[in-house]
Design a protein with these regions (language model features):
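Glycine-rich phosphate/pyrophosphate-handling loop used in enzymes and phosphotransfer proteins
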Residues: 1-214, 218-251
């Protein structure tokens, strides 16, 4: 085991750099992101639609929520086209330094980022999650993509979140049963078609409250396909938790 003197000397010779902006991190800093990048993240919080997690909700919804003790109504998008899941939460907006950090995790193998990003999701969203969650289920990657990358970022995030929430992680409860194109270059309609029927859930989800975990919510097509597979296998309640979400102009 290295002595504290040796560790300090190595920090001086080979200083750790922030994976986003390449600023030198302070000696002994455990967080792999620098303070400036961490502080620049635009965090999300209530008021939000309880179904899709979009924030902010409309003023009319806030007024109705204040007047009534009944469960709040969904946003207009969820009312007209309800998703397959029951509720969704995202910690922050997918932009700037958070986008770069997620890219560094996924595409540059910076696995250490899974811990602070998982903490971000937990700290920002845990208080608004319903109780009684039986398991966290990470969104599975295609087998060849996971083999090529060496890991599934959603599993890394789920492990950290599960540790913080004291909820078990069950990656075997959901499988990707066919390969799909990368979603990034597809339209919303193409994304839905691309992942339709791509997932199958274990019958172990029957009558369970499961929380899907992923890194980013973009159009929701992948998460909706996962939720449909879980619902078909008998899941009683399905939630979604992501580190980031794309905020569309229509939200």
């Amino acid at each position: 085991m290295l002595s504290s003197f040796t560790v300090a000397a190595l920090d001086l010779i080979f200083p750790a750099l922030c994976p986003v902006c390449e600023a030198t991190l302070g000696t002994g800093r455990r967080d792999p992101l620098c303070g400036a990048c961490w502080d620049s993240i635009t965090r999300l919080g209530p008021p939000w639609c309880d179904v899709c997690g979009a924030a902010p909700v409309l003023a009319a919804m806030l007024r109705e929520r204040a007047r009534s003790s009944a469960p709040p109504p969904p946003c207009a998008a969820c009312a007209s086209d309800p998703p397959a899941h029951d509720y969704a939460r995202s910690a922050a907006i997918y932009e700037g330094e958070l986008r770069d950090a997620l890219h560094a995790l996924k595409f540059s193998g910076r696995r250490a980022l899974a811990s602070p990003l998982g903490d971000l999701a937990t700290e920002q969203c845990a208080a608004s999650l319903p109780g009684g969650i039986d398991a966290l289920v990470p969104v599975p990657l295609a087998r060849e993509r996971e083999r090529e990358r060496g890991f599934n970022q959603s599993t890394l995030l789920a492990r950290r979140i599960g540790r913080r929430l004291a909820v078990p992680i069950r990656p075997g409860w959901l499988a990707r049963v066919r390969s799909t194109q990368p979603q990034s270059d597809l339209s919303a309609a193409e994304r839905r078609a691309n992942v339709r029927g791509a997932f199958r859930a274990s019958d172990r989800v029957a009558d369970r409250h499961v929380l899907l975990v992923d890194d980013i919510l973009t159009t929701g097509a992948t998460l909706d396909a996962c939720a449909r597979a879980l619902r078909a296998a008998g899941a009683r309640r399905i939630g979604v938790l992501t580190v980031a979400r794309v905020v569309h102009a229509a939200v």
